[in-house]
């Protein structure tokens, strides 16, 4: 069961593009606004005008918080931040082609699913990413680490998303104790 959360979806929640900040935001009632990192060039056209935070969005948000509670040990505030950004990415980002060429191939086969955390390796750097959308061959992942330089001119910043083929997702290192029978 979900522990007490800071923010549960309400009927008056709305997506809107903030011209002031140049990013998609979620109006969380009369006095609160949450800013996503997503700029106009990465958003679907509907996201550039006021848009209802629908029942489908609310269900995804709540389910995502539950998944985060199982996969990450983080504060409720961070769960809400990841879930709002994840919901925005899942529903309101333009479809992307995979950009796998930036990342090292994994030697292990992984099973990608919503809310699962993996590592991406790029130019000797290792970053943690969170799956926000998955298909048979590729996943849209959100960067959990602060920044990941992709090349000399481009970096992925925290909470930004990139689509990668599953063969680029590296499992997290898990240490397991083996008990003798």
From Swiss-Prot:
One of its GO terms (cellular component) is cytoplasm. Keywords: Cell cycle, Cell division, Cytoplasm, Septation. Contributes to the efficiency of the cell division process by stabilizing the polymeric form of the cell division protein FtsZ. Acts by promoting interactions between FtsZ protofilaments and suppressing the GTPase activity of FtsZ. Disulfide bonds: none annotated. Interacts directly with FtsZ. Pfam families: ZapC_C, ZapC_N. GO terms for biological process: division septum assembly; FtsZ-dependent cytokinesis. This is Cell division protein ZapC. It comes from the Bacteria. Belongs to the ZapC family. It is found in: Cytoplasm. Its main location: cytoplasm.
């Amino acid at each position: 069961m979900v522990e007490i959360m800071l923010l549960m979806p309400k009927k008056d929640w709305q997506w809107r593009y903030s011209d002031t900040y140049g990013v998609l935001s979620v109006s969380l009632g009369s006095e609160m606004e949450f800013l996503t990192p997503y700029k106009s060039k990465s958003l679907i056209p509907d996201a550039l005008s006021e848009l209802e935070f629908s029942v489908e969005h609310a269900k995804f948000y709540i389910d995502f918080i539950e998944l985060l509670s199982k996969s990450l040990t983080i504060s409720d505030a961070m769960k809400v931040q990841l879930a709002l950004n994840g919901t925005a990415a899942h529903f309101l980002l333009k479809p992307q082609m995979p950009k796998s060429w930036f990342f090292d191939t994994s030697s292990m086969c992984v099973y990608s699913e919503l809310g699962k955390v993996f590592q991406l390796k790029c130019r000797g750097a290792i970053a943690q990413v969170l799956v926000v959308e998955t298909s048979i061959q590729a996943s849209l992942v959100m960067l959990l680490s602060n920044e990941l330089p992709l090349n000399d001119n481009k970096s992925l910043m925290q909470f930004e998303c990139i689509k990668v083929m599953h063969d680029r997702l590296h499992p997290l290192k898990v240490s397991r104790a083996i008990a003798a029978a």
